[in-house]
Amino acid sequence: SHACEGRDLSDEQETIDEVQTLPLDSWHRRKGARMLPFAGYEMPIQYESIVVEHNWTRDQAGLFDVSHMGQLMVTGENAAEELEKLLPGAIASLKPGRTRYSLLMAESGGILDDLMVTNATPWIEGDEEEGTEGYWGDPAYYLVVNGAMKWDDIAHLREHLDDDVTLTHLEDRALLALQGPNAATALNRVMRNVIDDMVFMDSVVYDFGEWPLRITRSGYTGEDGFEISVPAEFAESLADRLCAEIEVRPIGLGARDSLRLEAGLPLYGHDITEEIDPVSADLGFALTKKRREQGGWIGHEAVSTVLANGPAQKRVG
């Protein structure tokens, strides 16, 4: 594939040039979506109009299908240490059920992708009758990477992660983002008491009937919101349940982009590329102080030089 010259992507990457369909493809079409290819998938660009959808999300709650994004799980005793070789953020100190924004770094100090990392280490319940205590299971980290970059990211992770760490691509899961000031109200009505104690960047697993969900309080619109990972086979039913709430309407990729821009959030491939280091991209917050000093991650030397001399240019806005 021209997109990743010289990288062996094994058999995982079927023909990348073929445009794929999302699990919710026919659902979007029934809702009147205008579909266009983006990041290798037919994506809903708009339903009614970008302006109407943008404003609805700012006032109410919008449902976005972001299933094109890559959902990955990294597991193993040394998972945190291994990820810290590739990401400049503090992963080892990330508590179970917490999420952090981070960057996948190139040796040049450029950014291969930006991503969300959640400590997904499971809590194993004890058994009162048997007198056994609950305990934390094997370390696990849930990663959400950009759709356009996911095959490159998977190849990069496979290349650099140690053999005793397992990387699983959760290809059978869809991802829905419910965003807007009334997102919590609507979600609470659908799933009572699940999100009551959740603060920004909290992540929980929850069995909604027979659907095993992962719900993270985050998003990319500048509004309060939740990203819900759901097995693809149940995605349509979940989308219907959410859109049955009066506050919720489906929102296309066009409004997702205008909301992101208005909130000043960077988009990989536009504001962030492999040619731009985190300091110039104004993402210095993703480099924790301790890890800046410690080093030991890909791209550290190049980034240290920029930190010492100041960036040549800086993203603003």
Question: How would you describe each model-predicted region?
Answer:
Residues 2-102, 110, 121:
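Acidic, proline/glycine-enriched N-terminal capping motif
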Residues 4-37, 44-45, 120-317:
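Conserved, structured C-terminal
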Residues 70, 74, 112, 141-148:
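Short coil/turn segments at secondary-structure boundaries
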Residues 77-113, 183-211:
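Internal amphipathic helical hairpin motif
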Residues 116-117:
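Glycine-rich, Trp-frequent "lid" loop and neighboring beta-strands that shape
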